[in-house]
Each structure stands twice: as C-alpha cells, then as structure tokens.
C-alpha cells in the first residue's frame, strides 16, 4: 500500500465476537482491471449518451465523435470508422462526463474505457475499469443481491480476491479476466444493483489473504452438504481450499436433483473423450473423495471396462447438465440415471451455505473464514 498502513479496529472486544476490518479509505491505490468482452469481431458498434472520445494509442491523438452510435471496423493495419476516421491498431474509447459506453454487440454499457484492439482475427473488445467498479457489475450475476447483506458482502470479498489473484491471467490476449464463467460473470453498468453496490462499498479494498497474498477465492452455488478439497478438482492442493462441512444450506433448489441421460448420448460423450464406448451396459462410482464426490467412474460394455474422472465427465457433459460430481449413478433401461446434490465444483465458498449462515447471524468475516481455511481478511496488497 502507498502511504500509511491500513488501520483496523475491533468491531467488538467481547470474547466470541469477530473482529471486522474497516473498509479501506478512498486514498488507496486504484487497481485497474482489463476485462475481455469480445474477440474476432469484424465490426463493433459503440455508443453513449454523450460525445465519444477516441484516443489513437499509436498516434497519441485524441478525437471526438458526436453523441450517437458509431461502427468501428477492422481495417488493414488498424481500425476505421467508415467515412469518418482511420486509426492505428489500438483505440481507447470513453464518453464525456464519464458516462458509460455501450457495446451494442453485448447489449451492455460499461464504466471506464472500452478498448478496441486490431488482431489477425478481427477486433478484440476490452473494458478497462477500476476494481471496485468492476465488482459492481459482477455481484448481481454471481449471487442474489436480495439475500442477507452479510452473505452478499462475503461474495463481494471473495469476488474481489479472485479478481486480484487473476490479474494477468489472459495477458497474451490483451486483458486480465473474461466476462464469463472462465473468470467471473460481469455485466457492466447494465447489471449493477444498489444492494450489490452497497456490499462492495461496505467491504472496499478487503481481500482474503494467506501468507500475506490474495488467495484463489473460488466459489460455487451449493456444496450439497460438504465442500471439496482443491486437489480433487484441479489436481493441486491449496492450503486454504480444504473440504469443510456445510450444514446450513436450506431452501436451495439444487439440494437434490436427478438427471436421466440416454445411454446413446453418454456413449457419444465418452467417444469424444477418446474412450472405446460403443455400448455402455453398466456404470459405477469407483472412487469417492472425503466429501463423497465421484473421483473415478467405471464404465463397462462388450469392449471391456474403462474409467473416467468425475470432473472430466462433468466437463464433457457440461456443468449445467451434470450439476455436480456428488452423485450416485446407475443404468436403468436405455438411460443412465444420476441422482445428486448441489451445484458447482464444490471448492471454496458455497453461496447457498453463506446465505444460511447469514440468516443465522454470522457476519461476512466469519462466513469467509469457515470456507477458506487459515485466511485473514485484510487490505489488498
């Protein structure tokens, strides 16, 4: 941090109550985040409710376009607004008065700067925005902002931490994070919500730290009763991503679910994975983790038996199809039937569990320290 050390005060000096960090002052160094929105586009239409300022980075020249919608096209060696202007390979577009810039192709408006980059594939669109404003556009898409405020605050801290830990992840593509589940869902100003904004502001600058560094604060919808240790999903054991009991989930629509999949569809998926699955006659869970999730599945048919990890199967089927790897499975006639619990990879914070804890009076620090082992809530480095 620049200047004075960040100060903390105790929310209470009574045994059993939690020490709540004070949100950071506005003087803290501003962290910019570059969010990849689109790639490979021949044309991108930008607009605003104010004149647009267009900075040609190569020429170091700024021009102004009147209020309205303008089409930016990929041209040889650069970018053009047909019949109006021609620029180098990178332009940075903002609006007078710091008004949001709309990317018509996404039907969304964004704070900060919208950057267009000419690549071999076309135009890449990047939103460069300060970290806290980025979070304004994340929270509503990742959690219900009508939930108890402490759960939404916990989400804000987890999302901020994950964003900081992910800076530079897609540097080769010209940005830090994507606006999809590859990173975190992000909808710009269009998806801001006053309750989400309040949660971000109430926790401004606070992140989860292990060894003084921001952690990989992944999260998911519903653990199904127990979270998972990271090595069982991504092959690497993080000391702060350990499986824990998650007993306070209530009212989740994902608590129990059933998926019936035609055997032919499953066989096609397995063949795409390189397995000789001409005919599947039986399926069983061959190994589970401590949380009960399927680590290995064994399939058998006329060609013999073969195995696939539960995580790999979920990836192949799609995470919205096979909601989690916490399931039992059987062949029933011409279908393979999965009966499971929860939704998501199961690592880190369970959002429905956080909601249940908040309903019981837990504050956001206590919620976070339940899901992330041996972490501190403190100032962003």
What are these regions (language model features)?
Residues 5-13, 19-381:
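Conserved, single-site charged/polar hotspot
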């Amino acid at each position: 941090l620049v200047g004075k050390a960040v100060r903390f005060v105790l929310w209470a000096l009574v045994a059993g109550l939690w020490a709540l960090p004070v949100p950071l002052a506005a003087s803290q160094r501003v962290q910019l985040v570059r969010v990849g929105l689109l790639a490979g586009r021949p044309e991108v239409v930008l607009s605003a409710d104010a004149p647009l300022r267009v900075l040609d980075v190569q020429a170091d020249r700024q021009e102004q376009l009147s209020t309205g919608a303008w089409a930016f096209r990929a041209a040889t060696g650069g970018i053009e607004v047909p019949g109006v202007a021609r620029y180098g390979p990178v332009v940075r577009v903002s609006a007078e008065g710091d008004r949001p810039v709309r990317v018509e192709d996404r039907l969304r408006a964004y704070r900060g700067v919208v950057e267009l980059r000419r690549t071999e594939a076309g135009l890449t669109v990047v939103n460069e925005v300060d970290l806290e404003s980025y979070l304004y556009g994340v929270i509503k898409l990742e959690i219900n902002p009508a939930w108890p405020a402490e759960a939404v605050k916990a989400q804000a801290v987890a999302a901020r931490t994950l964003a900081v830990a992910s800076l530079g992840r897609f540097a080769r593509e010209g940005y830090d994070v994507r606006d999809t589940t590859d990173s975190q869902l992000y909808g710009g100003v269009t998806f801001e919500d006053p309750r989400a904004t309040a949660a971000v502001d109430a926790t401004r600058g606070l992140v989860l730290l292990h060894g003084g560094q921001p952690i990989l604060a992944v999260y998911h919808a519903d653990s199904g009763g127990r979270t998972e240790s990271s090595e069982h999903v991504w092959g690497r054991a993080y000391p702060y991503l350990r499986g824990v009991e998650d007993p306070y989930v209530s009212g989740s629509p994902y608590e129990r679910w059933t998926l019936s999949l035609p055997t032919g569809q499953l066989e096609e998926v397995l063949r795409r994975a390189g397995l000789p699955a001409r005919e599947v006659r039986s399926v069983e869970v061959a190994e589970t983790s401590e949380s009960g999730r399927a680590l290995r599945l064994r399939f058998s048919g006329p060609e013999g038996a073969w195995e696939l990890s539960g995580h790999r199967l979920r990836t192949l089927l799609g995470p919205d199809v096979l909601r989690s790897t916490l399931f039992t499975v059987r062949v029933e006639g011409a279908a393979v039937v999965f009966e499971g619990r929860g939704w998501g990879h199961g690592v880190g914070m369970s959002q429905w569990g956080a909601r249940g804890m908040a309903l019981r009076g837990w504050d956001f620090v206590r919620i976070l320290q339940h899901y992330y082992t041996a972490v501190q809530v403190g100032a962003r480095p």
